[in-house]
């Protein structure tokens, strides 16, 4: 059995970190599942989220709810990329940062990596967060 590419795929990250690549797609249910997976990991937990696209009028509310879910799950750090992810970051509060520039996000994230860190990257395919994954894997 082989997992589908970029769907909860565990990879070796830089500085001995672990990366869970779930960058292929995103919707509210899949995001909740990803949060649950990350919450069960050992060590410092970092979640990188991109926008959930195609939610229409529900977009703002769904992204705010996600921020609360991530915080309540005990995730240590949240990094957001995309217009709606700004709302997710705002709901999470302390230890969350929003980026408009993907390269700045990659630079900041890379500086946080160590052997005690697990990073989960999740967003709609259109956000191209696979670029973040490719930059932080060993």
Please annotate each region the language model reported.
Residues 1-138:
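ATP-dependent carboxylate-amine ligase
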């Amino acid at each position: 059995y082989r997992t589908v590419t970029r769907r909860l795929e565990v990879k070796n990250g830089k500085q001995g970190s672990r990366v869970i690549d779930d960058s292929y797609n995103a919707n509210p249910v899949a995001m909740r599942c990803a949060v649950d997976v990350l919450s069960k990991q050992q060590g410092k937990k970092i979640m990188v989220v991109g926008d959930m696209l195609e939610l229409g009028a529900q977009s703002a509310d769904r992204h705010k709810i996600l921020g609360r879910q991530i915080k309540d799950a005990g995730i240590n750090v949240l990094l957001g990329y995309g217009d709606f992810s700004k709302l997710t970051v705002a709901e999470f509060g302390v230890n969350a940062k929003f980026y408009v520039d993907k390269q700045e996000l990659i630079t900041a994230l890379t500086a946080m990596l160590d052997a005690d860190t697990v990073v989960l990257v999740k967003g709609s395919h259109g956000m191209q967060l696979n670029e973040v994954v490719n930059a932080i894997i060993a």
